Structures are given as structure tokens and as C-alpha cells.
Amino acid sequence: MEVKKVLVIDNIDSFVWNLVQYVGTLGYKVKLVDNKITLDEIKKINPDRIIISPGPKTPKEAGNCIKIIQEVDIPILGVCLGHQCIVEAFGGEVGRAKRVMHGKASLINHDGEGIFKDIPNPFYGGRYHSLIAKEVPKELKITAKSLDDNYIMGVRHKKLPIEGVQFHPESILTESDNLKFPDLGLKLIKNFVESEY
């Protein structure tokens, strides 16, 4: 199935516009909505993919994001706060990181699957967060970790088409030393949007 429509859920963060631009650059229709969108409204839009954006608050303060993750049958990518929402939606724990990471790049090691398919390993991921996944539920697999502080940087549901990344693919700090990947963040988003689920 060719993906035509991507719904981006805005958790009131300026990075959301970079995500919207990435999806548009890939040639897909993108619709940006507030995090208070209802399940009925999502059904009317009928998207092929959902991206849950970063944001400044906690997962419990991210509008309807946790409920959406638990109830829709559409592939979902969570970025930063969106990733944390995925962890909490399935019973995991999100808490304060030992140090705040706002505008820092870390080397990230990953499993080479899902959104990480054909991505150099490791790569630099841009980090902007003070919260982190502390405990991942059994439904989720850890897919990526930061090499400098060993924090969880990626999760994937074991059965459902749901992935999350703590780092920001859409940040200028997300890059690779490999010249074959001049825009690594765009490739990560493309992998999600074009994955066969």
C-alpha cells in the first residue's frame, strides 16, 4: 500500500514544523493537528501513518496521545515526548534524566531494524529532553541506546507497528559521519513512512 496521508500530532513544540516539512519533502500529504484530537476525528481523517511530536510537558499532559497509542490501528512513530508517551501507554516508566540534554548530540547505537534500516551505526542523534524512559514494559523492545550515558533512545512494539525515538530525527544535530547519508533524519522519517506494516 502506498502511503498517502501522514497525521502529525502537535504537542506544542517548535520542532513539529521540521517533522511536517520532512513528510512534505518526501511527497506525502501531511495534516497537523492539536494533541487534543479525538479518536473519531482521527477516523474521519483516515491517515496511513501517525507521528506524535516532541513537546515540553510529560506524557500525562500530552492531550489524548496515550489513548491514541493504545486504541488506534495505524502505524505510529513517537518522537521525544511522543516516544515517552509510547512507553507510558504500555505501562512503562518515564522519569527525570540525571542531566538535562537540550541541544546536545550523542552517539546512538541501534538494532538496524524498523526505522533504523540502512542507517549507519552508530550515528549522532540530537537530544532535547529532561525526561527519559526508565523502565520499558515487556510489550516493547529497546532498539537504540546512547553510548555516552546508556539511556534508552529507541523502542519498538513487539507486535504492533509502533516505534519511538527519544532523540530528534528532525534536528540538525542528527547526522552521520558517512557522506552517503547527508540528511540522516530525513532517511529515518522515510523509513517509518515507507515501512511495510
UniProtKB/Swiss-Prot annotation:
GO biological process, one term: L-tryptophan biosynthetic process
Annotated active site: 80 (nucleophile), 168 (for gatase activity), 170 (for gatase activity)
Location of the Glutamine amidotransferase type-1 domain: 5-197
Disulfide feature: none
Keyword Amino-acid biosynthesis recorded: yes
Entry-linked InterPro entries: Anth_synth/Amidotransfase, Class_I_gatase-like, GATASE, TrpG/PapA_dom
A single GO molecular function term of this UniProt record: anthranilate synthase activity
Quaternary data: Heterotetramer consisting of two non-identical subunits: a beta subunit (TrpG) and a large alpha subunit (TrpE).
Stated name of the protein: Anthranilate synthase component 2
Upper taxonomic lineage: Archaea, Methanobacteriati, Methanobacteriota, Methanomada group, Methanococci
Gene expressing this chain: trpG
